[in-house]
A protein has these predicted regions:
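Cellulosome-associated attachment modules in secreted, modular CAZymes
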Residues: 433-496
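Surface-exposed repetitive/solenoidal architectures
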Residues: 1-436
Length: 496
């Protein structure tokens, strides 16, 4: 400004100023009543006449130099690289107009201000954290009670070496929700409540996944460390490696300790505990409430004197229904309570309509080993089965041969219309939500057999009255056409 009669706040200038009189880096001159606050100029751009604060080039690239500025809704900065610039279309934090996060700088700015943790956010791009190392959860200043919508995007390449409650979020509290978010190529290590997404959650988590490495001593999960009562985790998965050292407890491929609900979820990573480790599960270390419509392919391994190891759950004190596990369960010498599905089914625990096929192996001196459940003290098991060669038949569950496991008639009282699917004589049962669009016929997976089925119904127009043309009308438009073919192509050679 050449001469100011009014007020100037939260402004800066960096261009060169040349003149003979009334020259300043920010303002040339001003009226006695004019105010200037929180405004700055580049020290080499022009004379410092006392109007505004001069900053070096390095200081101009540091957020901390600009006292009182709003770097959440108005300004943005790439630390060490650029001067402040205006955010573009950042939103207002409401459900209809969430704050938009497009860059690493946006995410770190949001994480730094806990006063906004009750607002709504949406990712508008994938974010690469560029290998940055943190010592706390990234979003950790307070409990998160807002909504964080990943919008189908992912956050990648970060490392956290901290204590308790570490992960992307430290704590998701009641009312908070995270959805549609992927976490990839990360490493998180800590003590208790350690995970990829949330150390502690009492909110809701849906349609999220993690593919990284997580390690800690207690309540360690590929996605969530501790899932509080009332929290629902749905349509999520983890392929992460979960590791605990000696004396580790509550390790799960998806959740370390579950006192909420997990549904339509799966895990395919590994869960490994050291000597004297307790509560190790392919999906959940300890379940006290509900797990349904889930599966695990995770291998579970414990060291010497490890206790409560299960292909799906280490310990179950709640309800498990319509679940299965296929991973190997291995305990070291003197281990106990090892089960293909559940290590220990407590008196309050129920297991219904489940099966397991993974081998259950205990070292020398191990006790309480079962193909389905390792040990059950007054727990209930119904309509649940295990592969006869996988582990001992201790009376918990019904053993089936490989041939019987591939026959629908073997699974008494199971719902093969809306819950389960089986390609008889070919595969063991799968949950119906696992069947991908375009997989019309057996065997499982979208291939030329399905294409032939689809071609026979090409351009049929009576789908609304014909069971959606036997399912070939994938977009439910009433006609089997190019739009349905495009959907089928998206899943080609998937679902096996």
């Amino acid at each position: 400004v050449g001469y100011s009669y009014g007020s100037i706040s939260n402004c800066y200038s960096s261009g060169t100023v040349i003149g003979d009189s009334n020259v300043g880096g920010l303002v040339g001159g001003k009226d006695s009543g004019a105010a200037i606050s929180s405004s700055y100029f580049l020290i080499i751009s022009g004379p410092d006449n006392g109007y505004g604060t001069s900053l070096t080039d390095t200081q101009m690239k540091q957020q901390s130099s600009f006292a009182g500025w709003d770097f959440f809704t108005i300004w943005d900065i790439v630390e060490g690289q650029a001067y402040p610039f205006f955010k573009s279309g950042v939103g207002t934090g409401t459900p209809d107009d969430p704050y938009r996060i497009a860059t690493k700088a946006d995410l770190l700015t949001m994480a730094a201000d806990a006063s906004y943790y009750n607002e709504c956010y949406i990712l508008t791009a994938d974010i690469n954290m560029e290998g940055q190392v943190f010592t706390t959860a990234i979003i950790a200043a307070s409990d998160f009670t807002g909504t964080f919508d990943g919008n189908g995007h992912k956050i990648t390449d970060f490392t956290i070496n901290g204590g308790d409650d570490v992960g992307l979020f430290g704590q998701i509290s009641f009312g908070g929700s995270v959805k549609n978010l992927g976490l990839e190529n990360f490493s998180v290590s800590g003590s208790d409540d350690v995970k990829g997404l949330a150390g502690y959650s009492a909110g809701s988590i849906s349609d999220c996944y993690s593919t990284g490495a997580v390690s800690g001593s207690g309540e360690v999960g590929g996605l969530v460390g501790y899932n509080e009562n009332g929290c629902n985790i749905s349509n999520c998965y983890s392929t992460s490696t979960v590791t605990g050292g000696d004396d580790a407890t509550y390790l799960g491929g998806l959740v370390g300790d579950n006192e909420g609900t997990a549904s339509n979820c799966y895990s395919t990573g590994t869960v490994t505990g050291g000597d004297n480790s307790y509560y190790l599960g392919g999906l959940v270390g300890d379940n006290e409430v509900t797990v349904n419509n889930c599966y695990s392919k995770s291998a579970v391994t414990g060291g010497y004197n490890s206790v409560f190891l299960g292909g799906l759950l280490g310990v179950n004190g709640g309800n498990i229904s319509n679940c299965y596990s296929t991973g190997t369960v291995t305990g070291g010498n003197s281990s106990s309570c090892l089960g293909g599905l559940v290590g220990d089914n407590l008196g309050t625990g129920t297991v219904s309509n489940c099966y397991s096929t993974g081998a259950v192996i205990g070292g020398d001196g191990s006790a309480y080993i079962g193909g389905l459940v390792g040990y059950s003290y007054d727990g209930t098991t119904s309509s649940s089965y295990f592969l006869i060669t996988s582990g001992p038949d201790n009376g918990n569950g019904t053993s089936l041969t490989d041939e019987q496991m591939k026959q629908q008639g073997s699974f008494v009282d199971w719902d093969f219309d809306y819950v389960w699917h089986i390609c008889e004589t070919t595969n063991y049962p799968k949950l119906i939500w696992q069947i991908v669009p375009g997989d019309f016929v057996c065997p499982d997976g979208v291939d030329f057999a399905d294409y032939s089925f689809f071609a026979e119904r090409w351009l049929n127009t009576d789908c609304a009255s014909n069971n959606n043309c036997d399912g070939a009308d994938l977009d439910l438009s009433g006609t089997v056409d190019i739009a349905d073919l495009a959907i089928m192509c998206d899943y080609w050679l998937k679902g096996f």
